[in-house]
């Protein structure tokens, strides 16, 4: 994201709840989890990015030219620590954008990203602290963190932490094993090391704050 600017708000996104699907899967950590239907639409400034979606099908598309900050996508509310998010599609951007898993914790208030493709690396920002790396889903990810002071958030104007994993081998399809990232981040203070973090929403999203680009994605988990 663009540092010192929060690009998504819980109140700005529509949410419609649906029943979990019947199928189950075993996560990389070995925990059996039930796949759940998309029940949350992330739509912050989507009108500036031609955001279109089919919640039932789990698909969305967006196209932008020099937009204001926007974050759009599909996912779940609340999130959890063991979900494996699957995504596939296309993403192209000239600058200032990510394709990523995105979410928030309620307490401690925290914003997080697992960046799968990008035209701007948030860990390259001078305000970010690179603290380590994690290997997951066929690639190394750089880990960085940052503190936002007195900035808008899902709880109003607050000071809160941000955590990022940025994938070395960019991709437009695959699976994101969230537990691997959360466990790695906990070594650097994420969720104060809590075994069961207090999750707010959790989505696969496209974000941009400049440039031109487009994305079309299918999301499941």
UniProtKB/Swiss-Prot annotation:
Subcellular location, record wording: Secreted
InterPro entries, per database record: ConA-like_dom_sf, GH11/12, GH11_AS_1, GH11_dom, Glyco_hydro_11
Signal peptide limits: 1-18
Keywords recorded for this protein, A-Z: Carbohydrate metabolism, Glycoprotein, Glycosidase, Hydrolase, Polysaccharide degradation, Secreted, Signal, Xylan degradation
Catalytic reactions of this protein: Endohydrolysis of (1->4)-beta-D-xylosidic linkages in xylans
Domain called GH11: residue spans: 23-220
GO-annotated molecular function: endo-1,4-beta-xylanase activity
Principal localisation: secreted
Gene Ontology cellular component terms for the protein in this record: extracellular region
Enzyme Commission numbers on file: 3.2.1.8
Protein name, UniProt field: Endo-1,4-beta-xylanase 11A
Organism listed in the record: Mycosarcoma maydis
